[in-house]
């Protein structure tokens, strides 16, 4: 029987970590180097581990600093999750950088470039007739 509990717990963790980031409860100044948002949380079936996917808007250097800071505050974040969500075991957490938005923007840019090239070719072809 498949349970939906990991997904529900993931949504709770996502909400709480987002709240911590929004309210500035994570005191490390490097976390503020880039604009951070929680995009997804994957929790294992036994609820013992959670991957927190974050999207970071900023320079590559700011993204790197932010990921280093998040790696260092995992203990604090886990402790806060334990206080905020009633679970038998608080999951071990790991922050993972979500690059799907960057990939999506890159694909959109490539499509726009191809479309512009095709329009230029079509215009050049019409001039030739």
Curated annotation (Swiss-Prot):
Keyword field: Cytoplasm, Ribosome biogenesis
Q: Which Pfam families match?
A: RBFA
| Keyword Cytoplasm recorded | yes
Cellular localization per UniProt: Cytoplasm
A GO biological process this protein is involved in? maturation of SSU-rRNA
SUPFAM superfamilies named among the record's database cross-references: Ribosome-binding factor A, RbfA
Main subcellular location: cytoplasm
The entry lists its GO molecular-function terms as: ribosomal small subunit binding
Recorded hits in InterPro entries, A to Z, give: KH_dom-like_a/b, RbfA, RbfA_dom_sf, Ribosome-bd_factorA_CS
The reply to whether Cytoplasm figures as a keyword in the UniProt entry is yes
Q: What does this protein do?
A: One of several proteins that assist in the late maturation steps of the functional core of the 30S ribosomal subunit. Associates with free 30S ribosomal subunits (but not with 30S subunits that are part of 70S ribosomes or polysomes). Required for efficient processing of 16S rRNA. May interact with the 5'-terminal helix region of 16S rRNA.
- Similarity section: Belongs to the RbfA family.
| The protein's name in its UniProt record | Ribosome-binding factor A
The gene is rbfA
């Amino acid at each position: 029987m498949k349970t939906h509990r990991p997904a529900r717990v993931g949504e709770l963790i996502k909400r709480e970590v987002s709240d911590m980031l929004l309210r500035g409860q994570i005191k490390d100044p490097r976390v503020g180097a880039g604009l951070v948002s929680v995009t997804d949380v994957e929790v294992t079936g036994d609820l013992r581990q959670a991957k927190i996917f974050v999207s970071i808007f900023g320079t590559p250097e700011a993204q790197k600093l932010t990921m280093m800071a998040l790696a260092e505050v995992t203990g604090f974040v886990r402790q806060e999750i334990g206080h905020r969500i009633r679970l038998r075991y608080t999951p071990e957490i790991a922050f993972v950088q979500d690059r799907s938005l960057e990939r999506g923007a890159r694909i959109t840019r490539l499509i726009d470039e191809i479309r512009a090239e095709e329009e230029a070719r079509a215009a050049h072809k019409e001039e030739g007739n």
